[in-house]
């Protein structure tokens, strides 16, 4: 069973790996990825950086392409303010991805 954690407007879904997950149908995985298209996500990388951008595509090596991406460096003692660096289109190598969080879908609040 997958566990879901909501934090700061982002959702993290962790799926434990089992023998059954290796046999998961390609259609289910494809539909899951299609549901994430054009959604904002935060990707944490092995070097401590995080990228926030719009999910555009992935490949069989788990590389991810983000559009309108911004890079946030790991906060250090000398620089407490985390100002983003605008990257635009960014490719994140799959082997550098630690976690992916998808922004919650919220409907606009009209008064």
Curated annotation (Swiss-Prot):
Organism: Xenopus laevis (African clawed frog)
Protein name per Swiss-Prot or TrEMBL: N-alpha-acetyltransferase 38-B, NatC auxiliary subunit
MF-aspect GO terms: RNA binding
GO CC entries: cytoplasm; NatC complex; nucleus
One Pfam family recorded for the sequence: LSM
Phylogenetic placement of the source organism: Eukaryota, Metazoa, Chordata, Craniata, Vertebrata
Classification via PROSITE patterns: SM
Biological role: Auxillary component of the N-terminal acetyltransferase C (NatC) complex which catalyzes acetylation of N-terminal methionine residues.
Family statement drawn from the similarity comment of this UniProt entry: Belongs to the snRNP Sm proteins family.
């Amino acid at each position: 069973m997958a566990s879901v954690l909501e934090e700061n407007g982002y959702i993290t879904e962790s799926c434990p790996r089992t023998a059954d997950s290796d046999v998961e149908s390609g259609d289910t995985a494809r539909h899951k990825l299609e549901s994430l298209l054009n959604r904002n996500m935060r990707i944490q990388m092995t070097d401590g950086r995080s990228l926030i951008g719009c999910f555009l595509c992935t490949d069989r090596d788990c590389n991810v392409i983000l559009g309108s991406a911004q890079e946030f460096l790991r906060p250090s003692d000398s620089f407490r303010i985390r100002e983003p660096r605008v990257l635009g289109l960014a490719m994140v190598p799959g082997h550098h991805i630690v976690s992916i969080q998808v922004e919650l879908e919220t409907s606009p609040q009209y008064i």
